[in-house]
Regions:
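Extracellular carbohydrate recognition and processing domains
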Residues: 122-167
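Glycan-recognition and processing domains
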Residues: 37-91
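Beta-strand acidic-aromatic groove motif in beta-rich domains, primarily in extracellular
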Residues: 108-119, 574-576
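C-terminal functional module detector
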Residues: 212-248, 252-279, 285, 290-322, ...
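Short beta-strand-plus-loop segments that form exposed binding edges in beta-rich domains
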Residues: 176-184
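Catalytic cores of extracellular degradative/oxidative enzymes
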Residues: 272, 293, 299, 324-503, ...
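Solvent-exposed strand-to-loop "edge" motifs in beta-rich extracellular domains
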Residues: 103-109, 147-149, 567
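Beta-strand-rich domain onsets/edges
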Residues: 194-207, 213-217
Length: 588
C-alpha cells in the first residue's frame, strides 16, 4: 500500500498581553478540499411520479421545486438533483457496462450536467457533460457510458465540489442520479437504458465465518471491507449492522475520498458487524479489510472461498495508540440520525463502538419551520450507553445562510424560537442556563461558510460561543478561527463529520478528561479548551509545562519552553513536519 504524506501539523499559541493561551489544539491531514452542504432547507426527499419500463421511481433530494410538466407532448421532470431507481426486474446488483441515453430540455437545464452512480465501489464514478448552448435546438440527447454499473440501490457516495453540498451521493440512495452543477435546475424528458449483459454469474458458493477480537481477546464490532479480485464487494449479508442514511436503512457505508487516507484499498464500500459475521460468498479469492476507528491498526488479509466449504477467519485488532490510557477521549460533535426507541440506541451505539468513538453527539437539525432527525428524549436520561461509548442528544439550530449554523451540545431540552429565529443570542443564553455547550458549525472561509463568520462576529464578543467546528470532510479551515484567537477570544476547536455527510468519527475531537471519564467531564474539557481535532494523527503539546487549554502568564521577553510530539499510525502515513503558529503566522 502506498503511504500518503502527512501534509500539516499545526500548533497555535495566542499571546494576549501577559497571557499565553494554549490553543495548540489543531492537528490534521489534508486529504481533499470539500465544501459544506450549504443549504438551510431541510433534506427534502420527494418521490416523483415519473416512470419508464426501466425506471421504477425518481426521488428528488434537496429540492422543493421539483415538478412534472408536459412539454410538446413529452412528460418531463425538473429538479436540481434527480435520483433514479432502476427496476429490479430489469437490472439488480450487476457488474457490467450500461448505456444510459438521456433527453434534456436545453431551455430548462443547467449548462453543466453531473451523473454519478455506483461503479461497484470505485471512486471514479462521476460523468460530466457540458450541454450545447447555441439555442438552435430545444432537445438534446446524450448517451452516458456507465462502466461496471451495479444498480443495487445501495448508496452512491463520492464527492464533487458545489455550492449546495459537497457530497451529494452521501445523501442519495439509488442507482444513479443526474444533477445540475451548483444546484442549477435540469429537465429530463426521457431515459433509455441498454445493458451489455456481461455480468459474471456465480455457480458455486462457500461459507465465510468471521470474528473480530480486540487486544484483550474480547469480541468487538468493527468496519469490514470484503472484496473479490475485481474490487467488487458482495452485498453484505443479513448479519451486517443496519444504520440510517436520512430516511432509509442500509448496511453499506461509503468511505469518502476525503476520509480514505486511512482505508488501504480503492474500493469505497464497507459494512459494519457486531463482532461476528456469516455469509455465503461466490467461490474465489478475496481480500478482507478490517478497521476500528483511528487508534487501531487496519488489518487486511487474502483468503479463498471453496465450493460448499466453510472458511473461518479471526481478525485480531490492536491499537497503535491508546488515547484513553492517556486520559484523552474522542468525540464527534456533529452526527445526524434520528432516535425513536431503544432499538435505535442499540444500533447507533454499535455503530459508534465499531468506529471506537467515545462521545457521539446526535443533533436534531432545525430550521424556522420544524426539526429533523428528531430525538425521542433529552437530558441525562436520554444519554445512552456505558462508558466509554455514549450517545448524547443535541441540536443544530438555529441555522441560516445569513448567520450560519449553530450547534448546541449536552442540553436538557431543545431551544426553539421560530418567531425570533435570527436572535441567536437568546438561544445561546438559554442553552447556557441549561449547562450546555454552544458553538458554530462549518466554520470556514469558503463559499457559504461566510454566514458562520457573520454570526461569529456578532456573538463571540459577548462570550456566547464556546467552540467552532474547524475540521470537517477531511479539510481544516484555520483562518476564521485564528482571527478570533488573535483578538484574544478563547474558542475551542471542534471536529464533526456532519453524518451522513461522512463516516461517523472520520474526523474527531479529542478531549482530556483525566484518569476518570464521564460525559460531563468530556464537555467540560471541550469548553475549557483541553482538546485537539484530528482525522488520524495524535498530539501532545505543552508550553512551560502547561497542557492544552491552560493559561500561561508571561512577561515580555520571557522564554517559552514549547514541547510538541506528534504521532501517526505508521501503516498509513509519513510524518512530514510540525508547524508552530503565533498570531496566525507560522514561527517554525
Amino acid at each position: 500500500m502506498c503511504k500518503p504524506t502527512l501534509k500539516v501539523f499545526s500548533l497555535t499559541i495566542i499571546l494576549n498581553k501577559t497571557t499565553a493561551y494554549l490553543f495548540g489544539l489543531l492537528i490534521f491531514m489534508i486529504a481533499s478540499i470539500s465544501y459544506g452542504h450549504g443549504t438551510d432547507s431541510p433534506i427534502v426527499i420527494k418521490t416523483v411520479d415519473w416512470q419508464t419500463e426501466q425506471i421504477g421511481e425518481i426521488r428528488s433530494y434537496f429540492s422543493k421545486e421539483v415538478k412534472i410538466q408536459r412539454v410538446e407532448g413529452k412528460k418531463c421532470v425538473t429538479g436540481a438533483l434527480l435520483n433514479f431507481y432502476v427496476r429490479d426486474s430489469y437490472a439488480f446488483d450487476i457488474d457490467e457496462l450500461v448505456q444510459v441515453e438521456v433527453e434534456f430540455d436545453l431551455g430548462k437545464s443547467s449548462a453543466e450536467i453531473i451523473l454519478q452512480y455506483d461503479k461497484n465501489g470505485n471512486p471514479e464514478n462521476t460523468k460530466r457533460l457540458a450541454l450545447p448552448q447555441n439555442g438552435k435546438h430545444r432537445w438534446y440527447r446524450h448517451t452516458f457510458m456507465l462502466e461496471r454499473a451495479r444498480f443495487s440501490g445501495r448508496h452512491i457516495g463520492n464527492e464533487f465540489g458545489g455550492s449546495l453540498f459537497s457530497t451529494p451521493g452521501v445523501f442519495v440512495n439509488g442507482d444513479f442520479y443526474i444533477a445540475g452543477a451548483d444546484n442549477a435546475q435540469i429537465t429530463v424528458c426521457d431515459i433509455t437504458l441498454k445493458r451489455s449483459n456481461t455480468s459474471p454469474q456465480p455457480t458455486a458458493y462457500g461459507d465465510l465465518f468471521l470474528k473480530l477480537l480486540d487486544e484483550n481477546g474480547s469480541q468487538v464490532p468493527g468496519r469490514v471491507g470484503l472484496y473479490d479480485t475485481t474490487g467488487r464487494m458482495p452485498q453484505p449479508g443479513k448479519e451486517a449492522v443496519l444504520f440510517k442514511y436520512v430516511d432509509e436503512e442500509f448496511t453499506n457505508v461509503v468511505i469518502l475520498n476525503s476520509s480514505s487516507i486511512t482505508w488501504p484499498v480503492r474500493t469505497r464500500k464497507a459494512f459494519y458487524i457486531d463482532g461476528s459475521y456469516h455469509a455465503k460468498l461466490p467461490v474465489g479469492r478475496y481480500q478482507i479489510v478490517v478497521a476500528k476507528g483511528i487508534e487501531y491498526r487496519t488489518l487486511h488479509k487474502n483468503f479463498s472461498i471453496e465450493a460448499d466449504k466453510k472458511t473461518s477467519l479471526t481478525m485480531n485488532l490492536s491499537r497503535w495508540v491508546n488515547m484513553p490510557a492517556k486520559g484523552w477521549y474522542s468525540g464527534d460533535v456533529h452526527i445526524h440520525t434520528s432516535r425513536s426507541n431503544n432499538q435505535d440506541n442499540l444500533r447507533i451505539r454499535l455503530h459508534a463502538h465499531a468506529e471506537d468513538l467515545n462521545v457521539s453527539n446526535l443533533l436534531q437539525m432545525g430550521d424556522n419551520k420544524a426539526f429533523y432527525f428528531q430525538q425521542y428524549s433529552w437530558g441525562k436520561t436520554a444519554q445512552y450507553g456505558d462508558a466509554p461509548y455514549t450517545l448524547v442528544p443535541g441540536q443544530e439550530d438555529p441555522r441560516t445562510g445569513e448567520r450560519g449554523h449553530t450547534i448546541q451540545l449536552n442540553i436538557n431540552e431543545p431551544v426553539r424560537q421560530p418567531e425570533r429565529y435570527y436572535l441567536y443570542h437568546q438561544v445561546f443564553d438559554q442553552i447556557r442556563q441549561q449547562g450546555g455547550v454552544t458553538g458554530y458549525a462549518h466554520v470556514n472561509d469558503l463559499t457559504w461558510g461566510l454566514g458562520s463568520l457573520t454570526g461569529l462576529a456578532l456573538d463571540v464578543p459577548f462570550g456566547l460561543v464556546d467552540f467552532v467546528e474547524v475540521l470537517q470532510l477531511g479539510r481544516a479551515s484555520t483562518s476564521p478561527w485564528f482571527d478570533f484567537l488573535n483578538l484574544g477570544y478563547k474558542l475551542s476547536p471542534a471536529a464533526g463529520t456532519d453524518f451522513p455527510a461522512d463516516v461517523v468519527g472520520a474526523v474527531r475531537s479529542y478531549v482530556q478528561t483525566g484518569e476518570e471519564f464521564s460525559v460531563q467531564r468530556w464537555f467540560d474539557g471541550l469548553k475549557a479548551g483541553r482538546t485537539f481535532v484530528t482525522n488520524g494523527p495524535m498530539l501532545e503539546f505543552t508550553v512551560n509545562g502547561k497542557s492544552m487549554g491552560s493559561e500561561v502568564y508571561v512577561r515580555s521577553g520571557d522564554l517559552l519552553e514549547i514541547k510538541a510530539t506528534a504521532t501517526i499510525n505508521p501503516e498509513i502515513a509519513n510524518l512530514e513536519r510540525i508547524q508552530l503558529f503565533r498570531q496566525g503566522e507560522m514561527l517554525a
